[in-house]
Amino acid sequence: MAQNDSLIKGWQPVIGLEVHVQLMTNTKLFSPAKNQFGEDANTLVDLIDLGLPGVLPVLNEGAMKQGIKFGLATNAKIAETMIFDRKNYFYPDLPKGYQITQLHYPIVRDGVVEVNGKKIRIHQAHLEEDAGKSIHDKYDDKSVIDLNRSGVPLLEIVSEPDIRSASEAVDYLKKIHQIITYLDISDGNMSQGSMRCDANVSIMKPEDKEFGIRAEIKNINSFKFVEKAINFEIRRQIKILEANGVVEQETRLYDSIKDETRSMRTKEFANDYRYFPCPDLVPTNISKEFIESVRKDMDELPEEKQERFMSTYNLNEYDAGVICADKQIANFFEEVVKDADIQLAAKWIIGDLNALLNKHDINLAESKIDATNFSELIQKITDNTISGKIAKEVLEEIWIT
């Protein structure tokens, strides 16, 4: 925090995040095309995704259920009626010339998440379809379009401007990531674009009554880059204002190589997109009975799992919190302790295993460690077959083989 304090001395950052979460449904939001990552370009495209004349979208009920789950997990208001709108703009990877989204009647409003004891409000979360992907680095002399992503269901989670530092923005983003992965509505893989973040950043003097002019940083795809991009943007705006300049309301892009943001375009307003209700989709009513059926189908939330681990496994609050921070780790722990000492397993997961994951910047599923070999390792430490020092070497050997 000391670094941030010196960075913003005399200035108060004001930050809001828009988090785009790709939902894990079998098919796309309005078409029967498969929702799947990593397939050959333009092989998962339906006529509806292309917006050809005569085709009509049909809402994916699974995506609606996942949006409701997020609303319930964040103590939000679930819409009694949701309406889809057309957001009109031209871009090569948007063949219809509009995006189907929710402006006035989103599925979720007025949620809240707690981050380090502070409540950060969620303005709304709405369903919308993703655009295709423009690829600029495959050929030297041309750009190409992959429409596999076109129509993939997104839940866009819009926070209120309650965040006051880059590090707090990262903590909030990690909390959102934790919620969506615990609910199994998304894998949250930022490197694959399953979770992307836009950051709205402005600065003001602590005594000011109104927020400053904001810049939006688009499509940041890692926790580390979110922090770096916001910190750069704060410094940039401070430099402008302290030179008696004016911060422009604009959209900016973060360059991770140069560690800087650069201007993309003047920031648009809602009127620029000519929103109007989508004539192809009727309003969708959501009954209380339907919401309750979704609630009954929800997985255990992080706080609930942490409480259970404290009571069932006699873990202290800190250990349970660290293990339950990641659903993969929490499930891994429960598999390991079926045959291994609970406290020793917790110690090794929190310490050595997490250290390896952080060192190599991967998650548990991407590693070569599984519950069986880790449990056997803990058992050998427990019965003094091997020492702790040897166990560390064995863990490293498992890791690389």
Question: Which stretches of residues belong to each language-model region?
Answer:
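Generic N-terminal leader/presequence segments
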Residues: M1-A2, I349
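Basic, nucleic-acid-interacting segments
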Residues: A2-E300, E317, A340-I342
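Long, charged, helix-rich clamp/arm modules that form nucleic acid-engaging surfaces
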Residues: G245-T401
